[in-house]
Structure formats: structure tokens, C-alpha cells
Regions:
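Central "turn" residue of the DNA-binding helix-turn-helix
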Residues: 35, 85-87
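Short, leucine-enriched amphipathic alpha-helices that occur as contiguous helical runs
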Residues: 3-11, 58-66, 89
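Inter-domain helical "communication" segments and dimerization helices
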Residues: 1-21, 40, 112-115
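Terminal helix-turn-helix DNA-binding modules in bacterial transcription factors
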Residues: 47-84, 110-115
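Basic, amphipathic alpha-helical hairpins
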Residues: 10-25, 45, 49, 66-75, ...
């Protein structure tokens, strides 16, 4: 029950407060924001998502960036990367490619062709 409550609080915080959009937001800050310790948060996230704390943060960043890429606006890949909480375009490209199997630029291009 304690893990479920902690997981629910983590989800709510990520969805509503968008803490992950700050490039400096990390495992330590997440633990502090939830008033818990790293052991409990690690256990809760592993149980409910199968992810580590850092992977969970990156998951939210990628999901947010993915949504931004689908919006046909003039924002550059760099602007989307930074708005999503990545500290560099290189880091964004690497993480995005691991999830989607292509760069954000290629993903955006392919999606635009389908529209």
C-alpha cells in the first residue's frame, strides 16, 4: 500500500507539475520532492513500471517530446529537446532513437508525410 501511494504521488507530480522539463531535475530532486528516500521510490517504480528512477524521468521527457513533435508548429528539434528537459540535443536524439528507432527529425518528417 505504501508503494502504491508513493507511485501514485510520483505519477501525479510528473503529470501535473512537469518537473521533468527542468534539465537539472534528477533522481535526488525527485526523491526530495516526494519526501521519501531513494530506496522506497526505486522499489515503487520498479514494481509498477519496471523502470529505474532515471529511466522513469527519461520516459516522461521522451513522451512529452513525442507529443511536441506531433504538433505541427515551427519549433525546432533543439527547442523541443530543451522544453522536454533534455540538457542537449545529442542526449535527446540518443534517447529518442532508443525508443522510436529513428531520430526526432526523421520521426517528425515521416509523421508530416502521413498528415
Amino acid at each position: 500500500a505504501q508503494d502504491k501511494d508513493l507511485y501514485n504521488r510520483a505519477e501525479k507530480m510528473m503529470r501535473e507539475d512537469l518537473l521533468f522539463t527542468n534539465p537539472d531535475f534528477n533522481r535526488k530532486e525527485f526523491v526530495q520532492a516526494l519526501y521519501t528516500n531513494e530506496h522506497y521510490l526505486t522499489r515503487a517504480l520498479k514494481y509498477y513500471t519496471g523502470m529505474s528512477i532515471q529511466d522513469y524521468i527519461v520516459h516522461y521527457r521522451i513522451d512529452y517530446a513525442h507529443t511536441c513533435l506531433l504538433i505541427p508548429d515551427a519549433r525546432s528539434i533543439e527547442e523541443i529537446a530543451l522544453a522536454s528537459g533534455f540538457s542537449s540535443v545529442r542526449s535527446f536524439n540518443r534517447n529518442f532513437s532508443e525508443v522510436f528507432g529513428m531520430t526526432p527529425h526523421k520521426y517528425r518528417k515521416e509523421h508530416a508525410n502521413k498528415a
